[in-house]
A protein has these predicted regions:
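Pro/Thr/Ser/Gly-rich low-complexity, intrinsically disordered linker/stalk tracts
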Residues: 22-53
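Recognizes extended acidic, P/S/T-rich segments that occur
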Residues: 53, 57-91
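Aromatic (tryptophan-biased) beta-strands that constitute blades/sheets of beta-rich domains
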Residues: 72-75, 107-145, 153-163, 169-170, ...
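Beta-strand-rich modules
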Residues: 90-101
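Beta-propeller blade termini
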Residues: 142-149, 206-214, 296-302, 353-360
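Acidic/hydrophobic-patterned starts of short beta strands in beta-sheet-rich repeat architectures
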Residues: 151-161, 215-224, 304-312, 364-369
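Short, conserved, GDST-rich strand-edge loop motifs in beta-rich repeat architectures
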Residues: 160-176, 224-252
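Conserved small/polar residues in nucleotide/adenosyl-binding loops
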Residues: 377-383
Length: 383
């Protein structure tokens, strides 16, 4: 009992001394988003109105809701971004959310007889194909991300199409190319990027980051590419004729690139050599790219002000993370952490299938929690 009491006391003390995030939001470079008002018919007599609380809003901000110019809430709505309006009408209705202190407003047009509680966005499915082994494949929507690529304050969707023959790293086999589309919420397709034959399809291979990295109000797209990747304007990256796939459909040789794309047009703005590079396959734990081709990525405020993109490779044995900044013209490497470096060997094999970003020590700068290890924002110094 005594040991239990001491342990509980230490646990309570530890709970209270844990550092809290301490971001300076007056300096943090953020997205320039609108209010994001949406109105959804919940049932025949109720419409749900929801909106975005902006990081620039005062902490005590409150809101008024209007339907076709008529105020529908009795009192200002505080500490809330959700409202249920009693409305049985079947005709179109214009909902407006007004911030009382911020003096801003945003609108949403509820369609007549709105039949669904979601936006129906039509997709343009890519045509399938056939691999060198004669296997036919088709395409299905896979992962997606969001970002305001045109600066209108509204998110667009960046959608990854995976071929039906996508493989886990542990499996042999050819795959069709990975394809990315960008759609506006009204269904307009802005561009299509084809990753080409030298980027294998599978859950671990292509980690795509979507964020406004240079603060111009428009999100960029960053991901690993290869010879034959075709950007959103039709331009080919590297050697269009190169084919590094072996007889098992694996890619064990050939150059690897990191490309930053214009989020609005899909144009490749800069392509550099990918770090961490493949190097000696056995350093990662095997010789068939099962472990060397395990990728992760994230966006982190490493200096507490500007967003950086961090590209990661490996977690079963060797682990490498490389941080980059984009100033609108150049991708600049901020740092590289490599568990193969002297003094860092204990950090090999500590990762898993995901990572987390956050200010874990309360200094206002993001750290990266990589499985069982934590990397300081000024890496290559580990925590």
């Amino acid at each position: 009992m005594k040991c239990t009491s001491i342990f509980f006391s230490l646990l309570v003390i530890a709970t209270f001394v844990v550092a809290q995030p301490n971001y300076d939001f007056t300096k943090l470079k953020r997205e320039h988003l609108g209010r994001g008002v949406i109105a959804i018919r919940e049932n025949p007599s109720t419409v749900v109105v929801s909106w975005r609380y902006l990081s620039s809003d005062p902490m005590d901000e409150s809101f008024d809701i209007y339907r076709d110019g008529k105020k529908v809430n009795k009192h200002p709505l505080k500490n809330a971004t959700f409202f249920q309006d009693s409305y049985q009408g079947t005709e179109p209705a214009l909902y407006t959310v007004k911030a009382i202190k911020g003096k801003t407003e945003s609108n949403y047009q509820l369609p007549a007889d709105a039949p669904t509680g979601y936006l129906n966005i039509p997709l343009v499915r890519p045509e399938g194909g056939t691999t060198p082994s004669g296997q036919a494949y088709t395409y299905a929507p896979n992962d997606a991300s969001i970002g305001d690529v045109d600066g209108d304050g509204e998110y667009e969707i960046i959608l990854k199409w995976d071929p039906s023959n996508a493989h886990d790293n542990a499996h042999d086999g050819y795959t069709g190319p990975v394809i990315f589309d960008c759609y506006k919420l009204n269904g307009q397709q802005l561009w299509r990027i084809n990753m080409g034959r030298n980027v294998r399809a599978g859950a671990h291979y292509t980690q795509f980051m979507v964020f406004d990295l240079d603060g111009d109000g428009r999100a960029e797209v960053v991901m690993k590419t290869g010879d034959g990747t075709v950007d959103g304007t039709g331009k080919v990256i590297g050697d269009a004729n190169a084919d590094y796939r072996n007889e098992r459909g694996r890619i064990l040789t050939g150059p690897e690139y990191l490309t930053i794309f214009n989020g609005l047009t899909g144009e490749a703005m800069q392509t550099i050599d990918y770090v961490p590079e493949r190097g000696n396959l056995m350093d990662w734990g095997d010789g068939r790219a099962n472990r060397s081709d395990r990728y992760l990525a994230c966006i982190a405020y490493l200096d507490g002000v500007h967003p950086s993109v961090v590209m990661c490779r490996g977690y079963y044995t060797r682990t490498v993370l490389a941080a980059y900044d984009w100033d609108g013209k150049n991708l600049k490497n901020r740092w590289v952490f490599d568990s193969n470096n002297p003094g860092c060997r204990a950090y090999a094999g500590q990762g898993n299938h995901n990572l987390r970003v956050g200010d874990v020590d309360g200094d206002g700068c993001d750290e990266i929690v990589y499985g069982q290890c934590c990397l300081l924002y000024t890496s290559p110094r580990p925590r």
